[in-house]
Amino acid sequence: MLQLGPVLQFLGCQNHTWGIGVLVVSDAGDPPPALQVPAPAQVVAPVQMAVPGLSATAWRFDVAVPQTAAVQTVNYLLSGQSHSFDVPGIDAMPSMAYVSCNGFSDPRAKKGLQQPNALWSRLGRLHNRIDRVDSTSFGPLHLLLMGGDQIYSDDMWVKLPELQAWSELPWPQRITAPFTASLRNALAAHFSRLYLDRWSQP
């Protein structure tokens, strides 16, 4: 079963070929997800790795899409589900958006909001040309640039007892304390769960 994905990464454009990485996370032991792209796009067999601290496997497919004279929408299937992304035309400038500070530094702030993902929803509407900015349409968006705090992780200081205990040590002890295997594993599992939770939201 898919736990996350697809999450797309821009890999660059060379010789008028647009490169995209497709990230998918599935339950450990599941076969590779099936990815089908329309010709002349090509997909490379996926690489895989275990997700630290979780019973899950991360898969990455690389997709190469030859650019055409005009913008094109690439419709593809991932494990039977349809998805799409847009590729700018040859010599056209890609349309980009910029975001930072994804989430909440204090989880309590989220509870008081009716729509905690309102800005992500607006960005989706801009991409789909439903919304405009000052009467100007910006979709479809080809690239999303992310700045600082791509995912807030402040809660790790209270959710991980070993990390909290370390943070309460006097400074001389803190800087010499070993980075234990148990703390490393706890942090890996915490960040794996955090990324899966944040990036699986609609």
Cite the ranges covered by each PLM segment.
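Extended recognition/assembly regions associated with phosphoester-bond processing machinery
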Residues: 1-202
